[in-house]
Structure formats: C-alpha cells, structure tokens
Amino acid sequence: MTKNSLKTGPDELGYYGEGENAMGGIAVGETLMPALHELNQGFEEAIKDKKFLDEYAYYCKHYIGRPSPLYYAENLTKKLGGAKIFFKQEHLNHTGSHKINNSLFQVLLAKRMGKKYLLCESGAGQHCSATAAVAAKFGLPLVGIMGDVDIQRVNQNIIKAKHYGAKLKAVPGTLKEAITEAIKTWTTDPDSAYICGSVVSAHPFPKIVAFAQSIIGREIREQSLEQEGKIPDMIIGCVGGGSNFAGAIYEFLDDKNVVKIGVEADETAALSNGTTGIMQGMKTYLLQSEDGAKSLGGNSLGAGIQYFGVGPLHSYLHDQKAVTYTSATDAEILNAYKIIAKYEGISSALEPMAAAAHLIKIAKDKPKDFLICLSLCGRGEKDLDTLEQHIGKDFE
C-alpha cells in the first residue's frame, strides 16, 4: 500500500486526513477512554491472529452464506438502456442485509476479549436483529437499543431480535438517540461490549466497521473480474452512517478510474447540506444548528438512512473529492422500489433504493460496456407496511 493511499485508514488518534480538515478522532469524556483503548488494542491484536481471521471467514461462509452473489440485472439493464447493471446481493445474507458482516466480526471480537454481554443500537432494526442472531449463536446476552420512532415502523426486525433472545430498550427519538444511549450504557460496565452498527462514533469504531464490511468490495472485485473480465466502472450505494457503501468501495479507493457515488436521503443529507462539527465522539459533517449547539434532521422513509450525520471516512472522502455524494427524495426512492420489484422480482429495503433512484437517472447515458454495481444492502420485508401505505394502490 502506497504512502498516499486512501486505504491507509485513520491515524493512531482516529483521524482521516491531516490538520484542521481531518475527520474522525476521539472526542469523548475521560470515562470512555479506557474502554476505547482496550477495544482498539483488542482489534489490532485480533486482525493479526490467523486463527481469529480463519474463524471469521468460516462463519462468513457457513453462517452468513458468503460470498453474496454479484447478479446481472438483465431486465433493468434493458429497461433503462445504456450501462450494464449488476447488484451486489447483500440482501441474500442471513438476516437479510450487510449488517451481519459487522455483527459477526464484532461479536467474535467481544468473545475473544472475554466480554460477558453485548449492547447495540439500530435505526432500521436490521443491525439489532443481525447482532441478536449472532449473539444467540455464540451464547451471549444482548440488549438492543432503538428510538421509539423507529420501533413503530420496523416491527418485523424487532420481532426477530426478540425471537433470538435480545432484550429491547426503547429511547425517545431515532438512531441518534439510540447511539447516545448505547455508548452511555457501555461506559458503566467493563464486562459489556458495544457492537456499533456503522462507520460512526469515536475511534476505533469507524475503523473496525469498515474493516468488517470491506469483504463486500473484495468480493465485488473478484466476482466482476471472473464474470466480466474487468472491475466495475462505477459503484453506487446508499449512505446513512455509511457502512455498506464504505464496505463496497473500500477495496477500490485507490482505483481512480472507478467512479464512486454515495446517495443519502434528501431529508437527512449531511454531506450535501450539513456543516462540520463534533457529535457522538467524532468530527464529521452534521445537520446542526448554526451555533452547533444541537443536531437537526428530517424524516426519511428509509429508517436506516435517517441519520443526522455521516461516518468520518465519508466526510474525508467527500472533502478529498475521491467520492461523489448526492441525495434522493422519498418519492424517488419509492419509484425505484417499484421499478426494481417489477423488472427484477426483488423486494428491496428502502435504504438502497436511494442509490437505485440515482442509478436509474444516469444509467441510460452510459455506454453498453460500462459496468455499474449497485450495493443492494437489504431486503424489503421490514418496509412492507410502509410500502403498502404509500404505494400499495400502485400494484393493484
């Protein structure tokens, strides 16, 4: 890896980049520092341990069902004209999304570090149900923390998490409040492990989650070379905190000819409409008041991309102009869902349909040998009630 590689990751203090424009860091109180240092040390030791990495690889294959397919969306390609479109089918993983890649890695890490029980937060409920499944597999108790607003609309994931043995705790609000509560609880008990669900929060969480999710991009490279004889010309994915998209593009950060496009929800587009600030242990782009005293944010139909900030890696890549970030409205997301369902027979989660909405806009203008890979990071069961409410009549 070259010195100026974008894949070098954060420095020892958790910063991506240098100087006053660096993103990330460890902006937390002294009470949290010992736990973060312990976690970072445990992570660095684990990724040098072949036995640990082999165990992770074993369960990725035999428990999650990896590698997930790289699927040629032939009907959609013909419908749109132009680019040849592929889906990285993360929705076919056990528990229905990319989230389990990270849950498995961090639960194995917690087990290696001798932790007795687990904490996690979730917005769409997908991280909670995935972590609950892995916790059940390895016999560790789990407390899942979610905002009461999100719980009301993703009840299927909540039911699954309970079936796996998780205890659910509701806090007023959405994902932001759930993360805050999970971190606060973690600081009170050294026997606990906080399983962070995205590339957010204080160092080393963004680094750990990006490492776990980078399996997505490594598979994309291998599968695209095998199937098409070349790597994708473009990779596109949705961005809330940003873990699935980070995983999809991490392998390609030094491939300057690969166009990378992250798509936020229009109502909560921190990279498009936010400013830099410090919140939840990290410096990043945030939707915040003018004085930075409080966070702001709207509502999105995709609970997993309804986040007032974004992971610091994405803020850094945005400022470096290494990745393009844009946004999609709820109406565009719903339209993309209808198109994918009709032409490919796939009921997707709403979150990746933000990326699909942008893909639908641009694919027709690309040549036929231009390969676009969409990270289809979740399945749609959790959103069926919302979909029926908003567009149910369109299918009659």
Tell what function each PLM region has.
Residues 256-263, 268, 358-396:
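Catalytic phosphate/nucleotide-handling subdomain of diverse soluble enzymes
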Residues 117-119, 127-183, 270-279, 383-392:
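Active-site-proximal loop->helix
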Residues 215-228, 361-362:
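Phosphate/ATP-binding catalytic cores across multiple sugar-kinase/actin-like superfamilies
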Residues 94, 110-134, 138-147, 230-245, ...:
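A short, small-residue-rich loop immediately preceding and capping a beta-strand
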Residues 25, 69, 87, 99, ...:
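Buried hydrophobic positions in well-ordered alpha/beta secondary-structure cores of metabolic enzymes
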